[in-house]
Curated annotation (Swiss-Prot):
One of its GO terms (biological process) is carbohydrate derivative metabolic process. Disulfide bonds: none annotated. SUPFAM superfamilies: SIS domain. One of its GO terms (molecular function) is carbohydrate derivative binding. Keywords: Plasmid. InterPro entries: SIS_dom, SIS_dom_sf. Residues 28-171 form the SIS domain. This is Agropine synthesis conjugase. It holds the Pfam family SIS.
């Protein structure tokens, strides 16, 4: 289980140890990105669940700095459907498809990898093991090894890949800063989790199982509502979680914010081009409601100890550090609602969902 859920039971050294195999590969992955970038025009991220959260966050950053390549992020099932309808989208040697799955067993991602086996596009896989099903189709594979921190490991490897591509094709001069910053990221993640323990306990004290919880974020910070709100709180406990993009907040959603509802709102404010959107949302809550009328909290992705992390890289990894800050909230919320971190899932892993419909 992720060490960040209970930072008091571990240490920054243990955190780094769990990510050792990843840290050792950062430069190799970046080098692969640089070498591959010279002959591509498109980068297509393909994943599901937390991997898709990573992909979308990276795309938000490439949208800001990219000029010469096209970057897209697809849910694996959507990508498979598109390939079936239009196989030519991957029969192009100037396209790089980036596949990721922590387990290496996600069925729609595995099917995408199988479909790509004999296609002209370039491909790369990020997963736990080179022996996984996802890695069995001959694609270049980078593996995290056995680790409690698979989510962070895959994010770090994929970010290194993108750093190499941006360096080669987008005149991005921050690759050395990225690699050095990622080397110290495990310590920053651990410190953020330590910082999150008491706020998590305080939040859990006013939370109930039937309270809706809204995560509002923008830009690269969109990874936080998806990875923590959906992939942890909703998946493990069945809580009613809603994720809202800051750009959409004032278009209908704002009307759901009412004092009579027992809802909670967590605002994640990034340090990227989308920051003004979230500052507008924060201003709405500050100006429209008196203290205590609405349960809302503001978390700045810049509000954590980032010792050794380049400030410009902090804009990219800040959301991951913010997600680490929230991780200890999960066991606190579980205890407050009579659940545990080890409760079995109700449906996931028990229903063979992919392509289960009648032909």
């Amino acid at each position: 289980m992720d060490l960040l859920y209970a930072p008091s039971s571990t240490s920054a050294i243990e955190m780094s140890g769990q990510l050792r195999a990843t840290l050792q590969q950062l430069e190799t992955v970046a080098k692969f990105g640089r070498a591959t970038a010279s002959s591509i025009s498109s980068v297509l991220f393909v994943s599901a669940g937390a991997g898709l959260a990573i992909a979308r966050s990276l795309k938000r950053y490439t949208d800001q700095v990219g000029r010469n390549l096209r970057y897209e992020a697809y849910a694996s099932a959507t990508f498979v459907n598109l390939m079936r309808a239009n196989p030519s989208m991957v029969n192009d040697p100037t396209t790089l498809v980036v596949l990721s799955s922590k387990s290496g067993m996600t069925p729609e991602t595995v099917e995408a990898a199988a479909f790509l086996k004999d296609k002209a596009c370039k491909s790369v896989v990020f997963t736990a093991s080179a022996n996984s099903k996802l890695a069995s189709f001959g694609h270049q594979t980078f593996s995290t090894g056995i680790t409690t921190q698979a989510f962070q490991a895959i994010h770090m490897l994929m970010l290194s890949l993108i750093g190499g591509i941006l360096n080669e094709r987008e005149n991005w001069a921050l690759l050395p800063a990225l690699i050095s910053s990622l080397q110290v990221l495990p310590a920053a993640l651990f410190k953020a989790a330590e910082k999150g323990v008491q706020p998590g306990i305080a939040f859990a004290a006013r939370f109930a199982d039937d309270h809706p919880l809204y995560f509002i974020a923008s830009g690269c910070a969109g990874i936080v509502p998806h990875a923590f709100g959906l992939c942890v709180l909703q998946e493990r406990f069945g809580f009613e979680i809603h994720t809202v993009d800051g750009a959409d907040f004032f278009h209908s959603f704002v009307e759901t914010v009412r004092t009579a509802k027992r809802s909670h709102y967590i605002l994640i404010i990034p340090d990227d081009a989308s920051r003004p959107q979230m500052l507008d949302v924060k201003t709405f809550f500050d100006m429209r409601f008196k203290e205590g009328e609405i349960s809302f909290q503001v978390i700045e992705t810049t509000g954590f100890d980032m010792s050794g992390i380049d400030p410009q890289i902090g804009a990219i990894v800040g959301p991951m550090i913010c997600e680490a800050f929230l991780k200890p909230w999960a066991p606190a919320l579980a205890e407050a609602t009579g659940k545990t971190m080890l409760d079995p899932l109700l449906h996931m892993g028990k229903f063979d969902y992919y392509n289960c419909h009648p032909a």
